[in-house]
Amino acid sequence: MFAAPATMLVLAALAALSSAIPAAQTASKCSTGPVQCCDSVEHHTQPHVNNLLLGLEHFGLVKGLVGGLTGNVGIKCNPILLSSNDCTAQSVCCEHVHFKGNIAVGCTPANIDIL
């Protein structure tokens, strides 16, 4: 009964947060996995980001994200492969990636060289 509204809420929130942030292009590895190229990276305390995460928890789509969360949240992220350096947004290292990269938490700027 609530699945459709939950999906609509998540999609609307992701659409609202989608904005490209120019950054250096790179292809490397983080200690937590591959470097992610995210359309948007914002601090978890931003009201719209916090509301998105609370909504995901409320509908049972993720658990325990908000309580212990620190740092930044990446929106619409894709891993950057070693054979590619096609990131025209922000390159970050993230601790956990959810929903095939649509939400990534614990993100920090990738401290890497341009290849």
Swiss-Prot record:
Coiled-coil regions listed: none
Disulfide bonds, paired cysteine numbers: 30-93, 37-87, 38-77, 94-107
Single GO molecular function: structural constituent of cell wall
Primary location class: secreted
Pfam families: Hydrophobin
Entry's localization field: Secreted; Secreted, Cell wall
Residue spans crossing the bilayer: none
Annotated SMART domains: HYDRO (SM00075)
Signal sequence, start to end: 1-20
Superkingdom per UniProt: Eukaryota
Keywords for the protein's UniProt record, in alphabetical order: Cell wall, Disulfide bond, Secreted, Signal
Primary role: Aerial growth, conidiation, and dispersal of filamentous fungi in the environment rely upon a capability of their secreting small amphipathic proteins called hydrophobins (HPBs) with low sequence identity. Class I can self-assemble into an outermost layer of rodlet bundles on aerial cell surfaces, conferring cellular hydrophobicity that supports fungal growth, development and dispersal; whereas Class II form highly ordered films at water-air interfaces through intermolecular interactions but contribute nothing to the rodlet structure.
Subunit structure: Self-assembles to form functional amyloid fibrils called rodlets. Self-assembly into fibrillar rodlets occurs spontaneously at hydrophobic:hydrophilic interfaces and the rodlets further associate laterally to form amphipathic monolayers.
Family statement: Belongs to the fungal hydrophobin family.
Protein's UniProt name: Class I hydrophobin 21
Source organism of this protein record: Pleurotus ostreatus (strain PC15) (Oyster mushroom)
Record gene name: Hydph21
